[in-house]
């Protein structure tokens, strides 16, 4: 009776350990799949072209003065300020390492706002709106689908409207010639003869249509965008497109200019490649966190598997000895000892697959652009778990399969 109680107790301990190992495998496979997916998602985000030029684009604050013509100042001070600005422009124009440059308040990722525009049927659409100069489209290599980017403007109050493809679709236009839009509120305000004039509230023809690009994080997708294009800014940041491989030389020139004009080599600047990279800093952190936890889970599972298998296989030495006496080969013994763990891994995999798919779906449900889950990450996760488990078990199974039956039976 006592022997039966001991056997039952051992079986209970073994079953509880197997259940714990089963749970460990579910967590490990789950974390491994999530780690693989978020790594895939990060690679997808970084490798998908944003729709505009990113290489060699520098945003720099070179002019450290108030360029507002409404601010009162002495004529001598105004002339000195204008001379400094002209000198900076001259140096940039003469630099052989610069393809082109412009002054601009908005950049490809900054300076946008939301405005409500209406078409000729008064259909409203809240869309991202920028106020760039004509050079904006050329500098960022934005593709023009219809029309032309305007170059001539009669005055500072002369603005033209350009839409992207998504905005044309949102407004219900198939052709540029049919497209007319106006703003619900003034887009610009000018003063003429002492009176204030509000602009942009009357229907204006769309003069060009550009291809869509991603104005923010890729997962937000493309957005309807309007570009209110006017004369080139004489204020704002300097946006500089360098020739390939000449970024270092351009930076040296800019430091030299700042030293000559303001007696300092320090100025705020950022490369567009870095700005785009910063958009995905949280995605990098997420992928890194899941990778770390997946490695920890794998290590814990290996320890759990090692401890359980050490206990379990030693309990089966007598069974192994009898099977060897009855003619069981090494292959049969390997299958016998590994079969139980294969079932545990298989069961855990069956549970972890739908659970991981559901978690990925919940996390990415608001993403417009995302990497497909794909069967590949599940295959890789299963393969990794099998190889690691086999590596953990192989030494003990090999040792058990090579025992001397006579010694085991004699000890029994």
Regions found by a protein language model. Give the residues of each.
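Single conserved hydrophobic/aromatic residue that forms the stacking wall/gate
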Residues: 1-8, 12-13
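Intracellular coupling helices
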Residues: 8-10, 303-343, 402-411
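Conserved transmembrane alpha-helices of multi-pass membrane proteins
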Residues: 14-19, 23, 291, 368-395, ...
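Hydrophobic alpha-helical transmembrane segments of multi-pass inner-membrane transport and secretion
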Residues: 17-41, 284-318, 346-347, 351, ...
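Membrane-proximal extracellular/periplasmic loop immediately following the first transmembrane helix
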Residues: 39, 43-119, 123-124, 129
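"Rare, low-scoring activations can occur
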Residues: 83-84, 88-96, 165-166, 188-287, ...
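Hydrophobic secondary-structure segments that place a key small or acidic residue at a functional site
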Residues: 125-222
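Transmembrane alpha-helical interface segments in multi-pass membrane proteins
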Residues: 297, 318-364, 379-380, 384
């Amino acid at each position: 009776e006592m022997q039966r109680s001991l056997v039952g107790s051992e079986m209970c301990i073994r079953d509880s350990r197997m259940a714990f190992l089963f749970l460990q495998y579910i967590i490990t496979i789950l974390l491994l799949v999530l780690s693989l997916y978020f790594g895939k998602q990060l690679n997808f985000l970084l490798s998908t072209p944003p729709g505009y030029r990113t290489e060699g684009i520098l945003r720099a604050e070179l002019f450290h003065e108030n360029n507002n013509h409404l601010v009162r100042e002495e004529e001598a001070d105004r002339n000195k300020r204008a001379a400094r600005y002209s000198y900076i422009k001259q140096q940039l124009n003469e630099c052989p390492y610069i393809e082109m440059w412009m002054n601009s308040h908005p950049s490809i990722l900054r300076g946008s706002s939301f405005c409500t525009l209406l078409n000729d049927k008064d259909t409203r659409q809240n869309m991202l709106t920028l106020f760039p100069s004509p050079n904006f489209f050329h500098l960022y290599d934005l593709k023009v689908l219809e029309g032309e980017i305007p170059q001539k403007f009669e005055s500072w109050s002369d603005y033209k409207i350009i839409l992207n493809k998504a905005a044309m679709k949102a407004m219900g236009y198939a052709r540029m010639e049919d497209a007319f839009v106006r703003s619900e509120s003034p887009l610009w305000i000018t003063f003429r003869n002492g009176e204030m004039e509000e602009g942009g509230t009357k229907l204006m023809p769309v003069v060009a249509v550009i291809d869509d690009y991603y104005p923010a994080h890729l997962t937000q997708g493309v957005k309807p965008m309007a570009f209110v294009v006017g004369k080139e800014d004489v204020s704002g940041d300097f946006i500089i497109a360098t020739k390939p491989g000449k970024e270092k030389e351009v930076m040296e020139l800019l430091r030299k200019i700042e030293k000559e004009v303001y007696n300092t080599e320090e100025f705020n600047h950022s490369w567009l490649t870095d700005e785009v990279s910063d958009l995905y800093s949280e995605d990098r952190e997420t992928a890194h966190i899941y990778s770390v936890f997946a490695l920890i889970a794998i290590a814990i599972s290996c320890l759990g598997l090692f401890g359980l298998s050490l206990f379990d296989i030693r309990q089966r030495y007598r069974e192994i000895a009898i099977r060897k006496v009855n003619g069981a080969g090494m292959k049969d013994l390997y299958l016998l000892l590994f079969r139980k763990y294969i079932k545990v891994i298989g069961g855990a995999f069956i549970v972890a697959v739908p659970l991981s798919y559901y978690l990925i779906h919940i996390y990415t449900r608001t993403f417009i652009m995302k990497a497909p889950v794909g069967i590949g990450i599940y295959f890789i996760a299963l393969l990794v778990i099998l190889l690691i488990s086999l590596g953990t078990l192989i030494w003990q199974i090999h040792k058990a399969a090579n025992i001397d039956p006579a010694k085991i039976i004699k000890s029994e």
